[in-house]
């Protein structure tokens, strides 16, 4: 699996933004990706040193449209902890002109 196929998108929530101070970043990853694949992909894409990877599966939520019910897609989140001497990951453009 290619590195760009493993990491799908960053997760932007209040909790994940608070973790940025501790060099912990949250990403949605491929549901078949393992911890080692996530670690290698983050190190390859962002050129940083990963210390720890925590992975969790998120079940799909029940959604209704009138009398019809269905589920949203299941997903997998990875919380990546960087080493203290590693550079930060630039998730957003800070170029304010």
Swiss-Prot record:
GO molecular function, one term: structural constituent of ribosome
GO biological process: translation
Keywords: Ribonucleoprotein, Ribosomal protein, RNA-binding, rRNA-binding
Entries under Gene3D superfamilies matching the protein: 3.30.70.330
PROSITE patterns: RIBOSOMAL_L23
Function according to Swiss-Prot or TrEMBL: One of the early assembly proteins it binds 23S rRNA. One of the proteins that surrounds the polypeptide exit tunnel on the outside of the ribosome. Forms the main docking site for trigger factor binding to the ribosome.
HAMAP family listed in its UniProt record: Ribosomal_uL23_B (MF_01369_B)
NCBIfam families, per the entry: PRK05738.2-4
Family statement drawn from the similarity comment of this UniProt entry: Belongs to the universal ribosomal protein uL23 family.
UniProt subunit comment: Part of the 50S ribosomal subunit. Contacts protein L29, and trigger factor when it is bound to the ribosome.
UniProt name for this protein: Large ribosomal subunit protein uL23
Organism in which the protein naturally occurs: Lactiplantibacillus plantarum (strain ATCC BAA-793 / NCIMB 8826 / WCFS1)
Gene label: rplW
